[in-house]
A protein has these predicted regions:
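PLP-dependent amino-acid enzyme catalytic core
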Residues: 1-481
Length: 481
C-alpha cells in the first residue's frame, strides 16, 4: 500500500517505510493514498487482538506476520484480556484505556509500535539503528519508554516540558531503566518540545547520521493505526451488552489535545464502523473547540496549565491528517500548515468546515467543571475518573443537552485517576497533603479502588534522568547521545 505526505502527492513510500520514517521529508504526515476495503462486521467477531491484527494488516500490509506481532505486543501486559474494557456508568459507557503497563491510553499504541518498527526494519533490510524522538505532555513519554526500552537496534529519547507534567508522570519517566533510553526536560511547554522534535527531523534531513530518525508520537502512522482497534472493541461491547443492534450508530466523546485519539475514531468510521458523532473534548486550552465551531485555528494565545496536562496543547498535529482526508488537497494542506507556522493561525474554506462539522462536535471543560464532574460521577455512580476523562464526560453531557441525540454514548477514559491524585482527591473531598504517593494511598483507602502496580512501585525508585535544557539545545542533546 502506498503512502504519501499530507502536503505533497509525490515521494510515495510503502507502509513499512512510512512507519520507519515517521514524518515525511516535507514535514507532512504520511497517509495512505486510498483507505482499504474492510470487512468491519467480520472484524467485530474476534478478540481485541484479532481486531488489532485485522485492522493493522489492512492499513500496514507491507509489514508481515501481523497476528504474531500483535500477540507479542499485548500478551500478559494488560490487566484484562480484552485490553480496553467498556463499563456502564450512569447514562454513558466508559471505555477504559488505562489498563496497560503505564496506566494510560498510549499503552495500546506504544506496546504495538516497537513490534511494527522492528518488523518494518527487517522487511526493508535496514541495518542502522533507529533513534526514536518523542515529545510528551505526560503519558506518551513513559508509554514509549516502556515499549522501547532494551529493544535491540533502537534507541529512544523523550523530551517533556519542565514543570508541565504531574509528579507521577515525571516519576514514571525519570526512573526509567534500560540501556537505550534518554529522558530530558525542556524549559518551555509541550508545543515547544513538539516543535523542537519536528525541527530536529528537518535539520537532519539529508544528513549522514549514525542512526535513522523516527517518532513515537502520533505523527507516526504506526502509532496512530493501533488506536483504531478500541473503537471496534467498544462497539462490540455495546452489542454484547444488548445496548445496540448491529448497524446502530454510536457516539464517542474523546478527550484530545493532539487530535490523534479522535482521528483514530474517524478512521474507524472510514473503515465501516457505524460511528455517529465524534465529540472533541478539550480543556481550557480550547483551540480545537474554537476551530471546529468557527473554522479558524489560532494558536496565538497563552498556554494554560490545567489539571489535565496531557491536553495542554495548542498545536494539534494530527488535525493535518483530517484536513487532508476531508479535502483531498495536499496543496491546500501545505498552505494552511505554512500559515500556522508563520502567522500562527489559518482559516479553512467554508466547504471544508461544513464537512468537519458534519462529522465532529466540540466542547471544552475548565478545571472547575472537571472537578465538579469527578466529584459528581463518584458520588452518583461510585466511579472514579481522572480530569481528562471528566473533560470527555462534560463534552458528552453538553452534546446531549444541546442536540437531544439519544444514540449510545461512549466516553473514552484515557488515564488512571491515580496519575492525578491531587485533582481526584480534591474533587471527592479528600485530604491532598503529602507527596503524590501518599495521596495515591489515601485515595485508595477512601475509595477501595486499588492503585495500579506500576504506579505503586514508583515510590523510592532511583531517578536516572534529571537533565533540563533550553529548547534550542534539543538537537545538540540528541547528537551527543
Amino acid at each position: 500500500m502506498l503512502y504519501h505526505s499530507t502536503r505533497s502527492e509525490f515521494a510515495e513510500v510503502d507502509s513499512a517505510q512510512a512507519v520507519l520514517e515517521g514524518l515525511a521529508p516535507d514535514g507532512g504526515l504520511y497517509m495512505p493514498r486510498q483507505l482499504p476495503c474492510f470487512d468491519w462486521k467480520k472484524c467485530l467477531e474476534g478478540s481485541s487482538m484479532d481486531m488489532a491484527a485485522m485492522i493493522l494488516s489492512a492499513l500496514l500490509p507491507d509489514i508481515p506476520d501481523m497476528p504474531q506481532l500483535v500477540k507479542k505486543a499485548y500478551t500478559g501486559k494488560f490487566e484484562t484480556e480484552d485490553l480496553t474494557p467498556s463499563v456502564p456508568v450512569g447514562d454513558f459507557h466508559v471505555l477504559e484505556l488505562f489498563r496497560g503497563p503505564t496506566s494510560a491510553f498510549k499503552d495500546v499504541a506504544l506496546s504495538m509500535l516497537p513490534q511494527l518498527l522492528t518488523a518494518a526494519k527487517k522487511a526493508k533490510g535496514m541495518q542502522e539503528d533507529i533513534m526514536i524522538l518523542t515529545a510528551t505532555s505526560g503519558d506518551t513519554g513513559k508509554a514509549a519508554l516502556e515499549g522501547f526500552h532494551d529493544v535491540e537496534g533502537v534507541r529512544i529519547c523523550v523530551f517533556y516540558p519542565y514543570g508541565g507534567v504531574s509528579q507521577v508522570q515525571r516519576a514514571q519517566m525519570v526512573t526509567q531503566e534500560g540501556n537505550n533510553v534518554a529522558v530530558c526536560a525542556v524549559y518551555g511547554n509541550f508545543d515547544d518540545a513538539q516543535t523542537g522534535v519536528k525541527n530536529i527531523f528537518a535539520a537532519c534531513q539529508g544528513k549522514e547520521l549514525p542512526f535513522a530518525l523516527s517518532s513515537a508520537n502520533s505523527i507516526n502512522i504506526g502509532r496512530l493505526a493501533p488506536q483504531i482497534m478500541y473503537y471496534f472493541r467498544a462497539y462490540q461491547d455495546l452489542l454484547d451488552a444488548g445496548k445496540i443492534k448491529l448497524g446502530d450508530e454510536v457516539n464517542f466523546s474523546v478527550p484530545t489535545g493532539n487530535f490523534g485519539d479522535i482521528l483514530a475514531g474517524y478512521l474507524a468510521k472510514q473503515l465501516g464502523l457505524p460511528v455517529g458523532t465524534l465529540i472533541c473534548a478539550s480543556n481550557a486550552n480550547n483551540v480545537l473547540t474554537d476551530f471546529i465551531r468557527t473554522g479558524t485555528y489560532d494558536r496565538k494565545r497563552p498556554l494554560l496549565k490545567t489539571t489535565s496536562p496531557s491536553m495542554d496543547i495548542l498545536v494539534s498535529s494530527n488535525l493535518e491528517r483530517l484536513l487532508y482526508l476531508l479535502s483531498g488537497d495536499t496543496k491546500l494542506v501545505a498552505e494552511l500548515m505554512g500559515k500556522l507556522n508563520k502567522e500562527g493561525s489559518y482559516t479553512v474554506p467554508g466547504e471544508l468546515l461544513a464537512k468537519i462539522q458534519k462529522e465532529f462536535w466540540a466542547a471544552y471543560c475548565d478545571d472547575a467543571r472537571a472537578n465538579e464532574i469527578m466529584g459528581r460521577v463518584y458520588a452518583d455512580c461510585g466511579y472514579l475518573c481522572d480530569p481528562h476523562t471528566a473533560s470527555g464526560w462534560a463534552a458528552a453531557e453538553d452534546y446531549v443537552a444541546e442536540t437531544g441525540d439519544k444514540r449510545a454514548m461512549v466516553v473514552l477514559s484515557t488515564a488512571s485517576p491515580y496519575k492525578f491524585p491531587v485533582a481526584v482527591l480534591t474533587a471527592i473531598g479528600g485530604d491532598t497533603s503529602g507527596s503524590e504517593f501518599a495521596q495515591m494511598e489515601r485515595l485508595s483507602a477512601m475509595t477501595g479502588v486499588p492503585i495500579p502496580k506500576n504506579l505503586a512501585s514508583l515510590q523510592g525508585k532511583e531517578e536516572k534522568h534529571t537533565g533540563v535544557i533550553e529548547k534550542d539545545k534539543m538537537l545538540d542533546y540528541v547528537l551527543n547521545l
